[in-house]
Amino acid sequence: MVPGEEPARELMAVLLTPRFRRLVSQNELPGPGLNGPSSRNRRDGFCRKRRTGCSGPFQATQLWDGIIHSLQAQVEIKRRRHHLQTYKDCFTGSDAVDVVLSHLMQNTCLSSNDISCLKGVHLCQVLMNHKVFEPVGMKKLFKKEKELEFEDSNISLYRFLGNKSSYDCCKRQKDAENEFNETLRPGYEMISNPLAQEIGEERIEELIHTINGNPALCPNITVQKPFLRLSKEDVWKEQTLLCLLQLIHLPFLDNILEPPVKTQNLQLNKEEDLVITNTCLDRELIPSLCLPEK
């Protein structure tokens, strides 16, 4: 290879593809250097790589796989807008042509002076016909209509098909992880206090019974009765009354042990209904009234 041929190739690539984004420099390419004894070793290694890497019955398969892989890895995939509609995971036709031409320039088996933008467009057309990617926003109305043509422009949008896109694979893995986390999330996030839950349920049942006018609560609910503190005298009275009731079954024994104040009040209440008469006063008033005697 002539020492001045490599810069000429780079200049030709820039002139042919004005949108050229990435082109490996001469030091990064696996080709030979300009001068020096080390250039022979590089040249020998380069020739060996050319013989082994691009020869054999699987040469075409390796070339196509390399083009598709570089297209999937280097093309810019993002959300884009076209004809008042938004499409996800799309790339432009001009970006695809730039990536394909960059791969052709860097590949030692395919690099030649005949590489042009038109060949890059034809190569993208072949990839689209073989369902590597599909156009977005363009559909065939009739079966007899010709195949859609690939357009080298910033307006035409395309999207990868199947599992060939590494971007789609990463996205599907993330979606699967998110779904797995969502299925496990409720079990980890739900924290309950059984004691507080039981108290809340009891209060709700109490409220429902009071609203329905049914004071009787469910048998599962236990309500503590108010505790009355009794004096020693009251306790002795109750015990004595119980012993008497066991011996003599009379109902009037209930009021025997009550204090005298209460009995007096009861007697006064009973005496209010009685009529008190004065016999002396009656004897004096009856003759004066001249009432007929019976």
UniProtKB/Swiss-Prot annotation:
SUPFAM superfamilies: Winged helix' DNA-binding domain. Pfam families: DEP. Residues 71-162 form the DEP domain. It comes from the Eukaryota. GO terms for biological process: intracellular signal transduction. This is DEP domain-containing protein 4. The lineage of its organism: Eukaryota, Metazoa, Chordata, Craniata, Vertebrata.
